[in-house]
């Protein structure tokens, strides 16, 4: 964060959240995500009715702020920025976050300078060590094997739904979700 001049980074559901934290969450109209700071643990924001599920997913940090249906998650994000002393700082928004989410943050934290979080997220994700490259090669090989099995089973009249199901089954037989 410091290297690119960002004081905090807001990351919602998706591949970046999973990559950085291991948390797997789906995108919906209700915000779940984290605010990552230059120093210290992240602050997590979750719908109150999802708090227990969120706690199962969260492996880093224990500051979890839950919002009720009649409240604003963006006020909790703004509060986290204020609590950490960066309410007027540069706040990166993860690149796949919906506009409605970033606009909500802008409205709740008008003094914050919102900017793209891509230099942080893409900057980290594009650097691969030997272990990560080996995992990627293994995943690609598993997928090739699964596709070969499916292609061998294809016949005239096979539906897309059937092929998808066969592909998922082939991945499971190879020990992964797919």
Positions of predicted regions on the chain:
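A composition/biophysics-driven feature that prefers long, compositionally simple stretches
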Residues: 1-145
